[in-house]
């Protein structure tokens, strides 16, 4: 099984405050890896290290290495814009741009140099179909994306992410603002998307992690306490802290 991204001895600080301690975690290609743990445990910080989103915060420091196809993404010669094209991100709260559905999806491809209308039309249709939104919106692509429901907006954000053909999709609690039906649609979509993409999801919802992921990492106080196949971690955790967390004894 191919490792798509790998972290080796990753430590991270916000100013003086250390947020991650020696994280070693492989991310396997075409699998869903879930990161779980109590609030403030470091899981979202780690997720944002994977496409250098933390670079946007002043005073942060990272040591160790994170590789994408065996190339360290923190090397001096890495183009961060290109990295974020290859490693896309879907946030907790749906964040459609204040423009039409069509222009939301075409935004990334245009930035990366695609100007041909026919090509853009094809990308928009393809991405909306992949994100299970096409049938809902195909009659009115000029409609403002802000008029979509919360669940539709989140699927639009997924479509916008895949429109630039990433290798990896990062999802930071993508369902926490959604109702149960919208959540199930996003979960079904994730399982479908992993055929072509590698997915990493941060979630507070342990049932969600157990339903959709192939591998799970449990974080606590900046440490990766345990990493294993999801069915193994939830059924036979090797660490007492993991067992306490998933059985609801703390967190």
Curated annotation (Swiss-Prot):
Coiled coil: none annotated. It is found in: Cell membrane. One of its GO terms (biological process) is phosphate ion transmembrane transport. ATP binds at residues 37-44. Residues 5-246 form the ABC transporter domain. It is a peripheral membrane protein. Its EC number is 7.3.2.1. It comes from the Archaea. One of its GO terms (molecular function) is ATP binding. It is an enzyme of class 7 (translocase). PROSITE patterns: ABC_TRANSPORTER_1 (PS00211), ABC_TRANSPORTER_2 (PS50893), PSTB (PS51238). It catalyses: phosphate(out) + ATP + H2O = ADP + 2 phosphate(in) + H(+). The keyword Plastid does not apply. Keywords: ATP-binding, Cell membrane, Membrane, Nucleotide-binding, Phosphate transport, Translocase, Transport. One of its GO terms (cellular component) is plasma membrane. InterPro entries: AAA+_ATPase, ABC_transporter-like_ATP-bd, ABC_transporter-like_CS, P-loop_NTPase, PstB-like. Belongs to the ABC transporter superfamily. Phosphate importer (TC 3.A.1.7) family. Part of the ABC transporter complex PstSACB involved in phosphate import. Responsible for energy coupling to the transport system. The complex is composed of two ATP-binding proteins (PstB), two transmembrane proteins (PstC and PstA) and a solute-binding protein (PstS). This is Phosphate import ATP-binding protein PstB. It comes from Methanococcus maripaludis (strain DSM 14266 / JCM 13030 / NBRC 101832 / S2 / LL).
